[in-house]
Amino acid sequence: RRQRQMCIRDSCGGTCEKRPRTNEYNGAKSCAVASSLYVGETGCAFGCLGFGDCVAVCAFDAIHINPETGLPEVDADKCTACGACVKACPKMIIELRKKWPKNRAVYVSCVSKDKGAVVMKACKAGCIGCGKCVKVCAFDAITVENNLAYIDPQKCKLCRKCVNECPT
């Protein structure tokens, strides 16, 4: 079964309390439609819109929008890693990745390529591209490209020093 080797990750950590609303959208409650019309109700143009296109396409009832965070959550026991939710997300924040050892993982919960000051204003959880994680990683597993940190799962040893050093 594919599920044993793959998992779904939501690469947006901008929960409702971390991303203040800057405007209101009254159009169709569809991520695909909304993303073609505007950037979202928060200051982050890269974050989850929260309308649940990913939920609608899941044939296994494995993904839902958490009403408290406004973000998609995946039930790993139901998910078959078919990738339907990945294709449905116009913001490309849902990724299909190889499972890490013991289902542990360290990853960046942000896809914003904006500069640090813009990210900090839009979302308290966003990667500001400061590079502190790169400096503390003894395994050269982290790089910063386009103002965003990337963690190489082949090099990462799950020591979590980068997590402790991250200011966001």
Model-predicted segments: where are they?
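Short, small-residue-biased leader/transition segments that mark boundaries at the very start
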Residues: 3-8
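Small-residue-enriched alpha-helical segments and adjacent helix-cap loops
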Residues: 9-18
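Glycine-rich active-site/cofactor-binding loop and its immediate structural neighborhood
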Residues: 20-59, 63
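Short cysteine/histidine-rich metal-coordination sites, predominantly Zn2+-binding motifs
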Residues: 29-33, 74-76, 102-108, 144-146, ...
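Short Cys/His-rich zinc-binding micro-motifs
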Residues: 48, 126-128, 156
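Iron-sulfur cluster-binding cysteine motifs and their immediate structural context
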Residues: 53-73, 84-101, 122-128, 132-150, ...
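Solvent-exposed, charged amphipathic helical/linker segments at domain boundaries
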Residues: 97-116
